[in-house]
């Protein structure tokens, strides 16, 4: 029922406002103001030192050489070497400071993104491919690194150098300075054209990268299916098409980029040649010295370089803007209600007390605040749950049965507040769960999913999941559900490192570990979503023995595929198209000879499959 996000959602971003994004990016720089200040000072020193070679050159040509003063030549050369060494030291300090600045900002931004991701509602992850989100936290953040390391601070240094050279050029010869400035409008116009063209291309590049990452993540995760159905050639062709689109976007940006610098170089070269031609008559007339011309040519080259560098910095800014749009779009996604940090932790229910769970006329459909795609076939067709009501008291077990899509797992998801109902209420000990902080709600719940997820780490860590449990408490939890026997057979026991998603253990062993994980926190409410569907009969019997002890005093809601596992439930709800069609104990429902009885006898082999038509 999930409506996947369009792969073209990446292109649906609105027009960016550079000033707005730049101001927001600056908030990440503010905590490191001292580093920025130090880097700017170093850059100013470096810029000032660039003025020394032209002036020293003029001194040698106009004074030392005509006078034949070898000592002055040596002194000037020594000063030039000293200026260059100092400039190199300043460049080293600038690189070090901006590198530290960039890495610290990247560290802060990645941490913020990951913390925000963990607080987003489950429907958000239904809509967004994993690969796209990974791109946000990795590639997009990394693209901002150059902005902070060689963009912002270096841009300030370029501005200072440009201002200093502008003033010095006027002081050296104001007529030649005016001639040098005439090419500036052409440089600015070319830079504006480049800026407008390259921004579109960089946004396209970032979108293409996100699509490639999403495609790779999905295909790698489903590689067994790809190989099983011999889809390698088809998937390779699809990947080639995605990669070709990325290549084309890159080539367009390279084409624009390749045009820009030659045009700037032509403009500056023509300007320098014009300066030399214009200076020749004045030198011949004796109103301008050769040393002044040589110094001015050096100053002019240094004047044009910051202009070119500033445009290059703007290129860096364009890449950063394309990435920051996506990063801030993610950060602006509203978090799930009730996920704010709880400063005062409410005492959790004692497991032996259980809790009372009550559904009051609950209606739910995906798409309305549930965050999934809407079904346009009509208002009644989209309801996954229709007026579901029940109550489960401490120590009782409620079993949910029905065909696929009947709404069983949705009830579990609503209880965990992965989604919110559109109508009705869900109460926990008489308290609407929407008024409870999510952390408080989930502290009382032990949840075993049908699709078990184990993290790449040791067995004990997967059972503990960060909870302050001793090794002995972890072992006790495993022993109570029969997982200890399985764990002891692993090469390193509780220290055995599991592969990604628990790939180094079987499906049945993963389910046993998930039972231990759920029980380790001693929950008051157990939610079991077809928890024994992937284990064999022997393991299932062992788990059932453990569960019968663990359920004592606890409230349990179990989604069951094997009806034989819930015959002892306090009450069984039979769901059909989101409605409660039958309810009662196992014996009462069998006696009624309705849907439940037909399902049960079918599983027991008493009916042919045709007998279930219409169920």
Task: Kindly label every feature range from the protein language model.
Residues 113, 117, 226, 327, ...:
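Helix-loop junctions and hydrophobic alpha-helical segments within the transmembrane domains
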Residues 10-18, 41-42, 49-62, 83-130, ...:
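Juxtamembrane helix-loop junctions of ABC transporter transmembrane domains
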Residues 35-45, 150-204, 275-288, 305:
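Transmembrane helices of ABC transporter permease
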């Amino acid at each position: 029922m999930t409506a996947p996000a369009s792969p073209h959602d990446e292109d649906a971003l609105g027009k960016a406002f550079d000033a707005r994004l730049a101001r927001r990016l600056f908030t990440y720089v503010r905590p490191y103001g001292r580093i920025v200040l130090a880097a700017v000072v170093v850059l100013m020193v470096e810029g000032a030192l660039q003025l020394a070679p032209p002036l020293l050159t003029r001194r040698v040509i106009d004074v030392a050489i005509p006078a034949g003063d070898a000592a002055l030549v040596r002194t000037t050369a020594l000063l030039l070497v000293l200026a260059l060494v100092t400039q190199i030291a300043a460049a080293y300090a600038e690189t070090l400071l901006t590198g530290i600045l960039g890495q610290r900002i990247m560290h802060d931004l990645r941490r913020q993104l990951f913390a925000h991701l963990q607080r987003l509602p489950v429907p958000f992850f239904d809509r967004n491919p994993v690969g796209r989100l990974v791109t946000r936290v990795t590639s997009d953040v990394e693209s901002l690194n150059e902005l902070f390391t060689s963009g912002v601070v270096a841009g300030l240094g370029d501005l200072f150098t440009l201002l200093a050279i502008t003033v010095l050029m006027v002081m050296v010869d104001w007529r030649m300075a005016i001639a040098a400035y005439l090419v500036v409008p052409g440089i600015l116009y070319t830079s504006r054209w480049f800026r407008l063209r390259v921004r579109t291309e960089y946004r396209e590049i970032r979108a293409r990268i996100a699509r490639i990452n999403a495609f790779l993540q999905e295909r790698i995760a489903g590689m067994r299916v790809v190989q099983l159905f011999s889809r390698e050639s088809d998937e390779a062709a699809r990947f080639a098409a995605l990669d070709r689109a990325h290549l084309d976007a890159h080539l367009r940006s390279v084409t624009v980029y390749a045009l820009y610098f030659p045009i700037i170089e032509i403009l500056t070269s023509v300007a320098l040649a014009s300066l030399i031609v214009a200076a020749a008559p004045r030198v011949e007339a004796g109103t301008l010295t050769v040393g002044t011309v040589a110094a001015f040519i050096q100053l002019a080259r240094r004047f044009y370089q910051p202009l070119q560098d500033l445009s290059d910095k703007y290129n860096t800014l364009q890449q950063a803007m394309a990435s920051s749009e996506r990063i801030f779009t993610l950060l602006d996604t509203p978090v799930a209600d009730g996920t704010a940090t709880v400063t005062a932790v409410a005492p959790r229910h004692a497991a032996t007390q259980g809790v009372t769970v009550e559904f009051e006329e609950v209606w739910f459909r995906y798409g309305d605040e549930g965050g999934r795609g809407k079904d346009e076939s009509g208002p009644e067709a989209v309801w996954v749950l229709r007026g579901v009501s029940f109550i489960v008291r401490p120590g009782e077990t409620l079993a949910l049965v029905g065909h696929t899509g009947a709404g069983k797992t949705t009830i579990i998801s609503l209880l965990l507040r992965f989604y919110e109902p559109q109508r009705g209420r869900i109460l926990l000990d008489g308290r609407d769960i929407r008024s409870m902080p999510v952390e408080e709600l989930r502290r009382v719940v032990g949840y075993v999913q049908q699709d078990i997820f184990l993290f790449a780490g040791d067995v004990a860590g997967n059972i503990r999941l960060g909870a302050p449990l001793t090794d002995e408490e972890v072992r006790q939890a495993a022993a109570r559900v029969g997982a200890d026997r399985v764990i002891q057979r692993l090469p390193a026991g509780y220290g055995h490192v599991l592969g990604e998603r628990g790939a180094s253990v079987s499906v049945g062993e993963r389910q046993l570990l998930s039972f231990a994980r759920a029980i380790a926190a001693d929950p008051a409410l157990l939610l079991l979503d077809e928890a024994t569907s992937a284990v064999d009969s022997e393991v299932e019997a062992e788990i059932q023995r453990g569960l019968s002890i663990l359920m004592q005093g606890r409230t349990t809601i179990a989604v069951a595929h094997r009806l034989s596992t819930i015959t002892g439930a306090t009450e069984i709800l039979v769901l059909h198209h989101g409605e409660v069609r039958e309810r009662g104990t196992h014996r009462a429902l069998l006696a009624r000879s309705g849907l439940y009885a037909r399902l049960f006898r079918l599983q027991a082999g008493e009916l042919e499959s045709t007998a279930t038509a219409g169920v």
